[in-house]
Amino acid sequence: MKKKVIFRSGSLRMGGLERVLIEVLQTIDKEKFDIYLVIDDDCGEENIFEKDIPKDIRYFFLKSEELIRETEKYKAKKKNIIYKLIYNLMMEKENRVMYKNMQEILKELGEIDVIVDFDGGASKYIEKLDIKKKIVWIHNSISNLKKKEGKIKRFGKRLEKYDKVVAICDEMKEEIENIYPTLKGKVSRIYNPFNFERIEKLMNDESELTEEQIKMLEEDYCIAISRLDVIQKDYDTLLKSFKILKAKGIEQKLYIIGDGPSKKIIEEWIKEYQLENLVFLLGRMKNPYVWLKNSNFFIHSSKFEGFGLVLVEAGYSGKVVISSRCPVGPRDILKDGECGVLFEVGNEEELADNIEKILKNQELKKEYEKLIKERVKEFDSKNVMKEYEKLIEEI
């Protein structure tokens, strides 16, 4: 008899976690499981991945677009004490609505064998749900919580509510077990799955490019792909490294694909470092893979990461990956520097030196390209989904 499984997550907006969720839903064996999807937020037009949910999966939203919009109205003004109180009341209302709607969904679906809390967002009420087994996925490093003892304790208590905890790389698994020794035996490592067949098709698809973009593809450029958010992504270090290279007479072009709240700050840095003729912000691209395929190499400058999906995608495209040595994620993917180049977070001199080495040493470049292409085979969804399914079957 097939197990009935609910996957739950926060939204269907554009994001790495959401992309992984869709990949899981599209590739999990429906002969083994009856799959249902529960999403917290109905974001209307921002439900980018709603169209990609498999047709044979029923899905539900816990919060309406209207309720979310009403709460957001007060969030923007919560510096004012009155609005802050109203915002807190609205958040309490949202939590009540979510719990009530979840209970109604469970009543409609009948007995559920497993819930997969894909982003940990159900931890406030998970123990109240009449579901046999509960699994939580952890997608981000918890090292940034270490200095906040209260948050560390609260996070540990949340994890204790689940029967299984899944970390997306070995370093993250070790991190969780070291901070929370009582969880040893409950933590598994399962990589994020990648549909390389789909990526291969997109790498060769130039159908939606303009004439100007096709000309840009023919340039000699390296590439960075990430959200324009300087809280997590270390664009200052990245741009400073190109300033150093320019001072040495090395004029390497850099295309940056992505959008986000820090776009203006990054534009100001480009002007300040006089890189207007070398660094180009291309915005969000529906198909970044064709740009990856035609690039010289890939750079990822970040202060911290969860897994770093784009590093695997860059590796599959056969490009050298140069990345920050974040606490988790890139080190695991690049096998601590065996399959790519790592530099210390915030060290623009080291990054500039590494870029120069790759530009000047073609033998080294070819060796890294070969090694990373082989390494990323481990993340193929055909292999990873066997681990997903085994975990759900055996819990």
PLM region spans:
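Short hydrophobic beta-strand element within catalytic cores of glycosyltransferases
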Residues: 320-324
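Conserved acidic donor-binding segment of nucleotide-sugar-dependent glycosyltransferases
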Residues: 335-337, 341-348, 357-363
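N-terminal strand-loop element at the rim of the active site
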Residues: 7-14, 27, 31-89, 172, ...
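Acidic anion/phosphate-binding donor-loop and adjacent secondary structure
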Residues: 146-148, 174-178, 186, 193-217
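A conserved mid-protein helix/loop that constitutes part of the nucleotide-sugar donor-binding site
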Residues: 15-23, 220, 224-244, 261-267, ...
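Aromatic "clamp/platform" in nucleotide-sugar-dependent glycosyltransferases that forms part
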Residues: 284, 303
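A short, active-site helix/loop in glycosyltransferases that binds the activated sugar's phosphate group
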Residues: 124-126, 162-187, 194
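A short, well-ordered alpha-helix in the C-terminal region of glycosyltransferases
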Residues: 350, 357, 364-381, 386-390
